[in-house]
Amino acid sequence: FRSLDWHGSFEAYSDTKAKVYENTQVACVYNINDLATEKMVENADVQEGARAIGFTTGMPGRSQVGFVEDILCDRAFLDDRANSALEIATLEDLTNIGVLTPHLMANAAAATALARSYGVDPAEIKAALLKFRLDAHRIELVAEQGGIRWVDDSKATNPHAAAASLNSFEKVIWLVGGLLKGVDLNDLVAKYADRLAGAIVIGSERTQVLEALAKHALNVPVIEISAPENVMHFSVAAARDLAKPGDVVLLAPAAASMDQFKDYADRGNQFAEQVKIQLEQI
């Protein structure tokens, strides 16, 4: 929303983003499931010989990188791309990076497309994927017990990042809230309400979060943490009460942290610490 305010309109915002493809020499890599980006590539003024290379989390077509069952494949940079594909890595390989989410798969496919466009050997790409690790507090699995996963995405300090987290799991106990800095959560809550098995609301601007949940997720159990101290102790305890086997307790606050924590890392560390302490007591 702030980007749109800055640029004045969606069209101006889109035009600015599209400049990344201008004068491309080798390959315009784009998500085939994003029609706006595909249009940017179609309209881009590129150098002769530059190719449009799509990536997807699904089955790749010709000139695309994607997944055939559990294998990351290249169907763009080989001679017989009409009838065959090059294996790059498996989904099991990608689990070494972090929690296997749709956007992790998409990022791996995009990185593969970029690397292959410059002739990097498939074996070298696989080796790089096996070595790569996400930074802490980015959809990081903290613990798993009794069929319940506890995931730290404290780095999700805005609705866009929180949406990527919520989109990664089917049933979520959502730890949300903090310093909203004027951001409206109504669209986010409305879009992902059907994935919520519960919500734990923290932060100094809880009222706005509670109102969005009441409006768009009326049947979702909500617990407000109003205690000024030991916020994560009470939050994790509340999540334990709500969570059932198959649920993911997800810290993806969609807000900044400095109202109750030093920073997002402190928030994530306190979450992880309380999860481990309280799960040991079971």
Ranges and model annotations:
Residues 114-123, 127-137, 141-282:
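ATP-dependent carboxylate-amine ligase
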